[in-house]
């Protein structure tokens, strides 16, 4: 929350002053609609990308490093503002091509184990792999704390871990 109100960059502004304009949606739902097609970016972007876009364009500040404490902290803070909102990620219109690419990757068998995301997150959700209960693959709970990481990690860190695990 402190980082949310911290003035940074050449424009002398904080994320709290510029974020809704950059995100193109109200703060109370932003965590439930990203990733989404972003008009100014002209493509589908993640919440982390819109945070850095705001920092660079509206604040004149340096972007946060992807897995930095600041990025994870501000992402968690912003997602908390959407707690209770129904997940409503648009997969039609200008977002449809990105959705179809993601869907193809989700079902594509990869690696030495010849597995897809669906093998765990559809066929085995609710079961355990070692000490981890498999989810349905929803990402709206990220960033999240994992004991294995001894800290908070992003969706993208989890993706990297899954891909590494299937070799």
Locations of the language-model features?
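Long compositionally biased, domain-poor regions of proteins
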Residues: 1-2, 135, 161-164
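N-terminal Sec/ER secretory leader and immediately downstream segment
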Residues: 1-37
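Short, intrinsically disordered, charge-biased short linear motifs at domain edges
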Residues: 2-7, 99-108
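The canonical Cys-X-X-Cys-His
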Residues: 8-23, 74, 102, 112-125
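Short, compositionally biased low-complexity segments
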Residues: 17-28, 44-52, 127-134
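Short, flexible helix-coil linker/hinge segments at the edges of structured domains or between repeats
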Residues: 29-33, 40-43, 134-140
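Post-cleavage N-terminal segment of exported redox proteins
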Residues: 34-103, 126, 148-167
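An amphipathic alpha-helical core segment
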Residues: 118-145
């Amino acid at each position: 929350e402190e980082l949310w109100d911290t003035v940074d960059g050449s424009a002398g502004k904080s994320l709290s002053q510029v974020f809704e304009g950059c995100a193109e949606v109200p703060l109370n739902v932003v965590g439930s609609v990203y990733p989404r097609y972003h008009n100014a970016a002209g493509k589908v972007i993640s919440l982390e990308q819109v945070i850095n876009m705001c920092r660079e364009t509206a604040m004149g500040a340096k972007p946060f490093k992807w897995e930095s404490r600041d990025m994870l902290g501000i992402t968690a803070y912003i997602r908390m503002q959407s707690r209770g909102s129904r997940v409503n990620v648009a997969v039609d219109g200008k977002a449809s091509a990105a959705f179809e690419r993601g869907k193809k990757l989700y079902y594509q068998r990869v690696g030495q184990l010849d597995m897809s995301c669906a093998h765990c997150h559809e066929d085995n959700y609710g079961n355990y792999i070692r000490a981890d209960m498999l989810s349905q693959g929803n990402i709206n709970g990220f960033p999240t704390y994992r004991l294995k990481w001894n800290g908070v990690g992003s969706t993208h860190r989890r993706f990297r871990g899954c891909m590494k695990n299937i070799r």
